[in-house]
């Protein structure tokens, strides 16, 4: 009986240690992302990261082999976070009336989700120094959204909801102001109203009569 109790206690302690380790790893990633976005990757040292999470350098290296591994993990996690949200849009089954809500929902996500805001800021800062960052930025915030919208419009054209035209050109027209205000930052009630009006006018202009 005593062995069973000790065994369960050991399991609980092991689980608690794993939770602590996971929590510290997440803190390291988040604080590193903030530092990289504000200062640039090259300007941030592991000592700065350790100070931000109130730990020693040894704790950082316990979870990550190098500063580069921290960056790579951040990039992968943010990419998964972004794509998970984007993939909630079921293009093949969506209807014409959902265009406005989809656009506004994605805009709010990209301007309010702290990880994504910092991720974009990091890519903007680093795109001129690292070709990989430039490619990521284009794919995640320019090419990806345009391709998704074009795919959506292609289906809506086939279904007879939209006038026949170039789906990619339609996508560029709709996405342009959203991209502009992503880069500027900030979100006001007036801006949201203007963007909603932009989507409504776009829908009216391209609706098949």
Language model regions located:
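Amphipathic alpha-helical segments used for helix-helix packing
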Residues: 98, 111-136, 183
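Short, basic, alpha-helical segments at the C-terminal edge of helix-turn-helix-like DNA-binding modules
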Residues: 76-83
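Helix-turn-helix
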Residues: 27, 31-69, 73-74
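Short, well-structured alpha-helical segments
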Residues: 150, 164-175, 196
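Hydrophobic alpha-helical connector segments
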Residues: 73, 86-118, 168-174
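Short, charged helix-capping/linker segments at alpha-helix termini
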Residues: 42-43, 159-166
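Amphipathic alpha-helical packing segments from all-alpha helical-bundle domains
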Residues: 112, 131-158
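C-terminal peripheral helix-coil segments that are non-catalytic and often amphipathic
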Residues: 1-16, 101-108, 154-158, 176-177, ...
């Amino acid at each position: 009986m005593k062995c069973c109790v000790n065994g369960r206690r050991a399991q609980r302690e092991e689980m608690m240690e794993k939770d602590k380790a996971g929590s510290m790893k997440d803190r390291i990633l988040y604080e590193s992302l903030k530092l990289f976005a504000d200062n640039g990757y090259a300007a941030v040292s592991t000592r700065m990261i350790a100070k931000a999470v109130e730990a020693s350098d040894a704790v950082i290296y316990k979870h990550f082999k190098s500063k580069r591994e921290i960056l790579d993990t951040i990039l992968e996690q943010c990419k998964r976070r972004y794509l998970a949200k984007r993939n909630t849009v079921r293009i093949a089954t969506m209807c014409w009336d959902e265009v406005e809500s989809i656009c506004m929902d994605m805009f709010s996500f990209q301007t309010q989700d702290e990880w994504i805001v910092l991720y974009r800021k990091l890519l903007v800062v680093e795109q001129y120094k690292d070709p990989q960052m430039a490619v990521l930025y284009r794919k995640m915030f320019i090419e990806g959204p345009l391709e998704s919208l074009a795919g959506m419009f292609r289906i809506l054209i086939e279904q007879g909801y939209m006038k026949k035209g170039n789906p990619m050109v339609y996508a560029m027209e709709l996405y342009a102001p959203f991209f502009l205000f992503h880069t500027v930052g900030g979100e006001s009630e007036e801006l949201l109203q203007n963007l909603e009006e932009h989507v409504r006018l776009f829908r009216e202009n391209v609706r098949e009569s």
